[in-house]
């Protein structure tokens, strides 16, 4: 058995005493990814998606990215995003939504800066 323990002295990176909050967790099945949807954004939350199986295409902020199993997609608050169903093959994902995230040097509910690729 391998065990890892957190250090007793931990300095959080969160600004202004805010503590991020998990809003939702979803499992997106293969069948769901085959249906057309519209690009959308979340003004008040960050969304993280983990590609469990398959491959396809995903649009984030007007850029189309090839995605495959093992990829993580970061959708900062306010950024347009969604799948491109016609290019998806056996795609399933896990998704979480987080709010109240404030990291130094970034807008609220942003995990990465705009110049970093979200995949």
Model-derived segments and their meaning:
Residues 27, 95-97, 118:
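Structural signal for conserved beta-strand scaffold positions within catalytic alpha/beta enzyme cores
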Residues 100-119:
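Alpha-helical bundle regulatory/interaction domains
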Residues 78-101, 109:
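Ligand-binding loop in jelly-roll beta-barrel domains
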Residues 1-68, 72, 79, 87, ...:
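Generic protein-terminus/edge-of-domain signal
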